[in-house]
Amino acid sequence: MLLLDKINELKKIVAESSSIVFFGGAGVSTESNIPDFRSENGLYKTKNNFSYPPEVMLSHTFFKNHTEDFFEFYREKMIFKDAKPNAAHYSLAKIEEQGKLKAIVTQNIDGLHQLAGSKNVYELHGSIHRNYCMDCGKSFDLEYVIKSETTIPKCDKCGGIVKPDVVLYEEGLDDSIIQNSVKAISEADTLIVGGTSLVVYPAAGLIRYFKGNKLILINKSATAYDNEADLVISDSIGKVLETVI
């Protein structure tokens, strides 16, 4: 099937759907100049000036034992303060506005879906925009972490370490986020999966809960679920979704 035919098929599916859920990964934000993890230009493949590989530095153990190094890496490689939503984010917000898109389940931590206007967003891996004191629980915004005078941001109330509300390796996902995501996916008539290679578990396993009619995959590279999908589009997610609205 030609790309144009696939896009027309996608338009038809969206038009006939009343309960769509979008499940997205890092590829959704690469068009906002936020690197993904596993592609050739991704965080895990590109050179950096740190002594440890990124997947080690993004672990709970590393955060606990090398807190200063963690924050140096986190500020430099995980925060993209000036990133703006792209065509994919805005298109999804529009489909939600039309009443068709019921939820976005995202593996991203950048908050760009909300910035584009999406309301019902489940952030599996947390958000850079939420930070909290590990001792007293006080909440802080991203600006507080960025502008901290010390490498390790400290609570202005009790002096405890302010930790980003992002899920590190070795940490579990939030139960309520998982439950809401499972509920949304299991009740959807159409599931659009975009910008993810579906290799990160337990997040990727959520697709198993889909019982609806149409599974659509939009990703530049192949995924393990391609054979199970009703429609596979190997192209830019922003370009594809923009044609639907």
From Swiss-Prot:
InterPro entries: DHS-like_NAD/FAD-binding_dom, NAD-dep_sirtuin_deacylases, Sirtuin, Sirtuin_cat_small_dom_sf, Sirtuin_class_U, Ssirtuin_cat_dom. It catalyses: N(6)-acetyl-L-lysyl-[protein] + NAD(+) + H2O = 2''-O-acetyl-ADP-D-ribose + nicotinamide + L-lysyl-[protein]. NAD(+) binds at A26, T30, F37, R38, Q107, I109, D110, H125, T196, S197, N219, I237. Residues 1-245 form the Deacetylase sirtuin-type domain. Nicotinamide binds at F37, I109, D110. SUPFAM superfamilies: DHS-like NAD/FAD-binding domain. Zn(2+) binds at C133, C136, C155, C158. HAMAP family: Sirtuin_ClassU (MF_01968). This is NAD-dependent protein deacetylase. It comes from Clostridium acetobutylicum (strain ATCC 824 / DSM 792 / JCM 1419 / IAM 19013 / LMG 5710 / NBRC 13948 / NRRL B-527 / VKM B-1787 / 2291 / W).
